Amino acid sequence: RHRSFEQMRRASIGRDDDERRRLVRAMFQSIGMNSLEWLHSTGWSDERVMEHIEFPEHEPGEAERAAGNGQINITAHMGNWEIFPRAYGIHTRRRLMILMAPQRSPKLNDWIVRTRSRGFELVMTEEGALKPLRTLRRGDIVALLADQDSTRNPGIFVDFFARPAYTPSGPAHLAYRTGAAILPMVIM
């Protein structure tokens, strides 16, 4: 919580420290709620998933998919990022590959892989770029969380709220090598 509070202060988010504390509390409550929703949804049918998720009438990527081009979806740890890829794959009727960094705990990693991999292919980032390249060249979708400050993967530092933040370069390399569009997405 302290780190989140300090980051909000540096970014001038909130009128004062009291408001920042309320925002941090609300953020952690939201993460808890999203986690419970995800756990609850793991047994849902595709139809039930789509009863709870709406997509805009004209959403980004429609033209790319219609042309048969690959698509790179980038999201962040916002909203229910765990439910989104499954719903998006159902919505687009396209094969979806998720790139995932392995967790430190093998037991947690195995559990996450089992629960996340329903309805799409899950590939560990350490496996390299060959599978994502093939997926994009087939005209399918690769999705990843790009807001993690991890120097395990190639990237560069860019200023974010006046501080250097590590930004992975993998999505740009995949787009360059395949011509796939990069689409930022979020579920709210």
Protein language model annotation of sequence segments:
Residues 127-188:
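Membrane-associated lipid acylation/remodeling enzymes share a hydrophobic transmembrane-juxtamembrane segment
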Residues 16, 67-127, 138, 149-163:
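Catalytic core of membrane glycerolipid acyltransferases/transacylases, capturing the structured
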Residues 1-75, 80, 107-120:
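Membrane-anchoring hydrophobic helices of lipid-metabolizing enzymes
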Residues 17, 55-58, 126-130, 168:
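Structural motif corresponding to alpha-helix initiation and N-cap regions
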Residues 60, 84, 111, 128-131, ...:
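Short, hydrophobic/aromatic alpha-helical segments in well-folded domains
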Residues 21, 102, 188:
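Residue-level "edge-of-site" marker
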Residues 62-63, 88, 133-134:
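Short secondary-structure boundary/capping segments
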